[in-house]
Amino acid sequence: MKLIPLVPVLCLLPAILVAETRVNTSAGAMLVTEMAAGLEEPWAIGFLPDGDVLITERAGRLLLISQGQRREITGLPDVYAEGQGGLLDIMVPRDFAASNELWFTYAEPGLLGGATAVGKALLSPDRTELTNFQTLIVSDKTRSGNHFGSRLVEAADGSVFVTIGDRGTGPDGLEAQDPARIEGKVLHLTRDGNPATALPGYFPGVYSIGHRNPQGLTVDADGALWLVEHGAQGGDELNLVQAGRNYGWPVISYGEKYGGGQIGTGTAQPGMEQPLHYWVPSIAPSGLMIYSGKAVPLWQGDVYRQSEQRFHRAAGPRSGLRRRTHHKCANRPGARCD
């Protein structure tokens, strides 16, 4: 029986699978192959056009996996690797073969703690170092080590969406509701790092508001922007994000405060969006992908969502997002996943 490689499906896992394993699925038998081993808190993966792989480690290392060999790439700024911070996402633009450009999100250190930062750099021709690193945008620094957000995705027109968490100010903090701030927002930037969206009364580049800690973001074939974000104690959400919309945090939520207690005014408020789906109890959603590969036609358009404990597949947007299956993956015992 022919085995289909499963690597394109599993690329959003927070850890790299380290064994070659045969997996039976609804689309037939598939082979999960080892890409790398011995990684330390890998956070994101970027695929280069020739098949080389870039991996970020939260402590601040960028690794290149090429022909089975691993080496570190230098040239990154210092990162604030405390709490949930560190070196976070990486995005390889579609024009990388011509531009050599890479985008990053990371926690920038400061006297008052860390801040979510967005930057870009050029990868040297020999792929050993980053050059011309530019910091494009930085949130306010806070002593909280939580809720950096930090997912990057490229739109069809080459512009970039990025998520910024509310920075862990809690249900009583209203940073996510303030359109003049970037915390608790989705931002929309040009490839130069300038605002790609300008909404009246909003900080330049703010695309949507009212987010807690969004860590999964993807664009579907029709250009729609999909997002998953962590709730508090319950209330994780899947949202279809549109410009100028308010997604409610912390005024409305289907979760509750840690230890119990209502968040905000309840679960609904005029002028605030309802999630397409929410989870109680929490599932800790950390990645999101809509399958567009050719290897498994049956899964075209299906939604893949990674959590700390499971890898889920659901029928795609045109099928009403009904859940189909889930695949259990590695868990970190005792971790607080928010």
Task: Report residues per predicted region.
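Conserved blade-ending motifs and adjacent loop-strand segments that build the rim/top face
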Residues: 211, 322-338
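Blade/loop signatures of beta-propeller domains
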Residues: 19-31, 125-130, 192-200, 254-271, ...
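Short loop/turn segments immediately following beta-strands, especially the blade-tip
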Residues: 121-128, 187-196, 241-248, 315-323
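Short, conserved, GDST-rich strand-edge loop motifs in beta-rich repeat architectures
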Residues: 108, 162-183, 235-241
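Predominantly a core beta-strand signature of beta-propeller blades
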Residues: 32, 69-72, 132-134, 195, ...
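Bacterial N-terminal signal peptides
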Residues: 5-15
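Acidic, Gly/Ser/Thr-rich repeat motifs that build Ca2+-stabilized beta-propeller blades
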Residues: 19-170, 216, 223-231, 281-322
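Repeat-solenoid scaffold signature
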Residues: 205-237, 242
